[in-house]
A protein has these predicted regions:
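Conserved N-terminal subdomain of the carbohydrate kinase-like
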Residues: 6-18, 33-116, 130-135, 285-299
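Short, conserved phosphate/pyrophosphate- and ester-handling motifs at nucleotide-, phospho-/glycolipid
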Residues: 31, 168, 231
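Histidine-anchored nucleotide/phosphate-binding helix
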Residues: 23-32, 129
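Conserved phosphate-binding/catalytic region of the ribokinase-like
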Residues: 181-299
Length: 299
């Protein structure tokens, strides 16, 4: 479940008009490289159009769960990235059809075993989970500082029902009240999740769970064109790998973090979904080998 939207992005490398974006879009496209039964729940306006929807369906993603609101306008976000590509200014946010989004879970989705609750209001995330007749084998939740600012109690209520939380380092500190990420993880894991992933952008990601810690590197990239969908592509790759292997343990979680990191590293190479549209399995395999060699050493 996640947003399917239009973005307009400006970075030091260029700018775009309205292009396809949204957390649900990036996550679904990313997951589709690892798992062949990706199903997407979201909402779009009539303005989205078949050509844009085809970007998603061309990768085999099931869009029965996407509501198309007649006469409605799709969610739109415009932002400008600073030179460091880590900080950005939001220029425009138009919720449009997202404002009254009430997720519908089609009958064909009811056997879902692996659920990603993409970045959305905690109420929508909880509603999505409640509308599945059986609790999935694994529930992954992505959120952001905005919801911590305005809906912390609702967010904490959802956290009691999820298995994996994925947030960035600033959000981990805000949610826990601890500066040390190790201490922050201990506090957050008491809130409900069995595993926690803390994304650190160009510095990789940390995985906490089962009393263990894993640090995944980030691949140093010569050029980063657009980091907008990176976190969502990471989440999609992460859950896509776990859906493929089906067994949940710390070893598979570690591999899933690396797969997620690999997919995210492709996503940032072009604007929007452009790179994920042309990506091949051979490129993914080569990138995974690069990740392994990056952190492999003998003592």
């Amino acid at each position: 479940m996640g947003t399917v939207a239009f973005d307009a992005i400006e970075t030091p490398f260029g700018k775009t008009d309205k292009i396809v974006g949204g957390a649900g879009t990036f996550a679904a496209l990313s997951a589709s490289f690892l798992y062949d039964q990706v199903k997407l729940v979201g909402v779009i306006g009539e303005d989205f159009g078949d050509d844009n929807l085809n970007i998603i369906t061309s990768k085999g993603v099931d869009v029965e769960g996407i509501q198309i609101i007649e006469g409605g306008k799709s969610f739109f976000w415009a932002g400008k990235y600073h030179n460091d590509m880590n900080s950005r200014d939001t220029i425009t946010t138009e919720l449009n059809v997202l404002e009254n989004f009430d997720p519908i879970i089609p009958e064909s989705y009811q056997d879902c075993e692996f659920l990603l609750l993409g970045n959305a209001t905690p109420q929508v995330q909880m509603t999505t989970l409640n509308r599945l007749k059986n609790k999935p084998k694994l529930v992954v939740l992505d959120t952001m500082n905005f919801w911590m600012d305005i809906a912390m109690d609702d967010l904490k209520a959802v956290l009691k029902h999820v298995d994996v939380l994925t947030i960035n380092d600033g959000e981990a500190r805000q949610l826990s009240g601890e500066y040390s990420l190790v201490k922050a993880a201990a506090v957050i894991l008491e809130m409900g999740p069995k595993y926690l992933i803390i994304k650190k952008g160009e510095h990789g990601a940390l995985l906490f769970g089962e009393g263990q810690i894993f640090s995944a590197p980030a691949l140093p990239l010569a050029e980063v064109f657009d980091p907008t969908g990176a976190g969502d592509a990471f989440a999609g790759g992460f859950i896509g790998y776990l859906a493929k292997v089906k067994t949940i343990n710390f070893t598979n979680m570690k591999n899933a973090v690396v797969y997620g990191s690999a997919l995210a590293s492709f996503c940032v190479e072009k604007f929007g979904t452009e790179r994920l549209q042309t990506l091949t399995q051979e490129e993914i395999e080569a990138r995974l080998k690069a990740f392994v060699s990056l952190a492999k050493f003998d003592i």
